Amino acid sequence: MSQNGAVATNGVMLEELSSWPEEICRRELPSVLPRLLSMYQCSESWIEHIRILKIIVEMFLPHMNHLTLEETLFSQILPKTIQLFDGMICELTSEARELSSQNLEIQITIRNILQTMVQIIGSLTGCVHHVCATQESIILGNIHSLPSFILHIIKSTFVHCKNSESVYSGRLHLVSDLLQTLFKEAYSLQKQLMELLDMVCLGPSEDENSILTMVEVIHSLMDICSVISSMDKAFHANTWKFIIKQSLKHQSVIRSQLKHKEIISSLCEDILFSFHSCLQLAEQTTEPAAQDNADYRLFQKTLKLCRFFANSLLHYTKEFLPFLPDSCRTLHQLYLQIYSKFPPCLYTAKISKVQQEEIAGTFLVVLDPLLSQLLKSQSFVQTVLASKLDLPHELQLPQVLLLVVVVDKLPSQPEDVQTLWCTEDMTRMSILKAIFYNFGQFSGELSLPAHLQGVKGKGQAEVPVTLYQRICVHLCTFVASLHPTLFPELDAALLNAVLSTNMSTSLLAMDVWCFLARYGTAELGAHHVTLVAHLIKSCPGRCVQLTNLSVLLRRLFFFMAPAHQVEFIQKFSPREADNLHLWQYISFQALPADLRKQVTCEVTGVCTAQCRKWLSGSHTLAELDSLNTALSVLLTVCNSAGEALDSRQLTAVTEVVGQLWAFINVEQIISQPHVQQAFSLLLQLLAFFIQTVDLQLISQVVNVLTLVIKLEPPDHVSLAVLDFLSSLGKLYISQTLRDKVLPSLSCIVASLMVNRNWLLEQHTLEAFTQFAEGTKHEEIVSQCLGSEEIKNKVVSFLEKTESVGETEAATADNSGEQKTDTFWEPVAKVTLEEAKGSAFQPCTKRARQELLLEEEYRSAFQTATRALETTEALLKHSRAPAWLLSELGALQERIEKLKCCVLRG
């Protein structure tokens, strides 16, 4: 029979079958179905294919045994159906290039293909509906080819609809109605299929094919999610909801087969996409409180979508955590990306505080329990604390914020989880070390006034806290809860951070260490002081690490119990030469009054003897090191001993300083570092004794300073010169020396005021202000303000105005670019010996030293007085600004109110 004849015969048969009643279809099913299936396989006409498919589904499917559907029907027709559908997609893509409103033939062809595709999807929907209607519980093995083939068609349909703008270009309007119908049919088919799959139960004894089919279904639905995410948000969310539901429902049999990494990655991508959309909408919303605002309603819907995806991730992670080692990097990046868009990060989205709180209360709260789950994952710990994390600059602060959240959670975790986070190995740091390391990487956020949500004490108003304060407080809280077995790791992390060349890191570690000294036992504090003292003694020379250790020693010494201070003095006696340099780092104010007087006397005697030894020696540069140590310790005594330094000791120090000044050589000050140090120390000591120093010596000193400044000495020498100059304001200079000293002072100030080093210029302004406030020689003030440039600088300094304006955004950008390259290597590791039980009671800790209220009053009053004196001095030499009179009137009113308060008591 010819092909045309066969088609005609098939057409007659199909026409006849379409008129059969239900009873005949049921009776003739065994004989007719094989013939229909054969025709379906052999036919080359799309129209005939769809006719056969509709007859099978609508007339014969209802009479088939549901237990044998796979063998008798689905495995026979679905492969051919997929082949036909894919061919139609290819045909559409090819014909669409020729589509136009003038080319009716192509237009009709394309529309016919789209209509045929709609009919195919409708027939498949009928198959799914029949299976759902005839069974209460579905065995996947009886229909295992149906879900996979249907999902292939659904995905192909959605992809074609998504790409329709590019496929049909500017002629989309010619077929948009059919494309919309096609999308709706595919949407309906997927909903029907998900209802079917929801009726599937997989037991432990399920065969491997059924398990693989369910896994394939979940993965296919995940692929569909990536297609429809930008097409229909509600449908996208419902598909994810179904994926999570089925994954959890069948987890006992499919967990080892699922592509967990891809699922987690897709979920995280959808979370971030929704989150960024939410932020963009928040930035566009001008009135977040207006409920009728369309942008605000869309913002709320998107925010709920964020919460939904986060909850989905939470549930999935909870059940499959042991299978997620490969997903930990993705989860880590998710947290960092989200944190980077919130204060105090430089790259925060510009949204209102109300919207920030709304996002935090709706979305971010879900991430908190997710992090709690991840704490137990060794892979997550390894990822977050990796030694070679190499994060971009904008994620450095988010990393620290994440670690701070972790340390807040660790105290409630079992000891093994705490140990996991607090110990380190070859590939990862401990969490404490990681915080300190990353803290030194974001100088921008620390330099800006980034204030976080405040803290409120009992009966007190909320006070905003800085980023530094927040991190420091959380670290201290964690240290207070740390298990004793982890103290060696704490000590090692603190010491490594203190020895860091990054100032912020070092200061943070010192603050935490001081809290530990205050919170821990007196014995622990004494042990730490001894440890730091030994480290200082072992430093080979002056370096950043020595400076950091010396500051730490000075601070820790205040927390020592008196009994332990006595032991320290005995162990590190200043009478021993190798101990003397330690005492330049210890504030004598930390000692009790009696002990302070005793140690002051002893140290002063040792140091003055050392100076006299140098004076009676050969005065070589090689011997200057020991002299500088003695001078440095003497300066510490003078600055901190207070009344413990009696008149006899003051006289001895003054005499030896005067004798040493005679050996100062201007040329050596410029070229020899040891001479520079001695020169600076002598200037500071002279400044301390300025009221008792012989005026002839002061005249000599000023002459030397004039020569030194002309030679442009190192900055630290210039700073010492400024300290000395500021002290001269306290001094009354006799008429005989005034003409020699005062002009030189104005030259020195003028030279330093125009220095290009901004730090030196700032110190010059401060020193000049102190001098002007205290001096009785007012003529020198006008001499120093000789040029208009210097006068403007002084006025700007006093008015606290910025010399160069900069926008807030520019400040943030510049701060963000100032990334500090921190040298971070473990300098030392320290471990404590295991504590042994002891019968004696621990020593009483050092009582906290409160600043007396009267001293606070006096300090505040002196500050106000100095400010008025400075204003008075300026008025004598320059014209008053227009606003000054009104400000003085306001100040007078405030003084009257203060008087009334004092009188009322």
From Swiss-Prot:
Q: Which residues carry this modification: N6-acetyllysine?
A: K845
Tell me how the protein is altered or processed after translation: Phosphorylation at Ser-101 by PLK1 strengthens FIRRM-PLK1 interaction. Phosphorylation at Ser-796 by PLK1 negatively regulates its interaction with PPP1CC.
Keyword Phosphoprotein listed: yes
Per the database entry, which stretches of residues form a coiled coil? none
Q: A GO biological process this protein is involved in? A: interstrand cross-link repair
Q: What is its main location?
A: nucleus
Residue list for modification Phosphoserine:
S101, S796
Compartments, record wording: Chromosome, Centromere, Kinetochore; Nucleus; Chromosome, Centromere; Midbody
Keyword vocabulary terms for this entry: Acetylation, Centromere, Chromosome, Cytoplasm, Cytoskeleton, Kinetochore, Nucleus, Phosphoprotein
Which GO terms of the cellular component aspect does the record hold?
Answer: chromosome, centromeric region; cytoplasm; kinetochore; midbody; nucleus; spindle midzone
Summarize subunit and interaction data from the UniProt record for this chain. Answer: Interacts (via its N-terminal region) with PLK1; controls PLK1 kinase activity. Interacts (via the KVVXF motif) with PPP1CC; controls PLK1 kinase activity. Interacts with FIGNL1; may regulate homologous recombination.
> Briefly, what is this protein's role?
Regulates PLK1 kinase activity at kinetochores and promotes faithful chromosome segregation in prometaphase by bridging kinase and phosphatase activities. Phosphorylation of FIRRM by PLK1 negatively regulates its interaction with the phosphatase, PPP1CC, thus creating a negative feedback loop for maintaining proper PLK1 kinase activity during mitosis. In complex with FIGL1 may regulate homologous recombination.
The name of this protein is FIGNL1-interacting regulator of recombination and mitosis
Q: Which gene encodes it?
A: Firrm
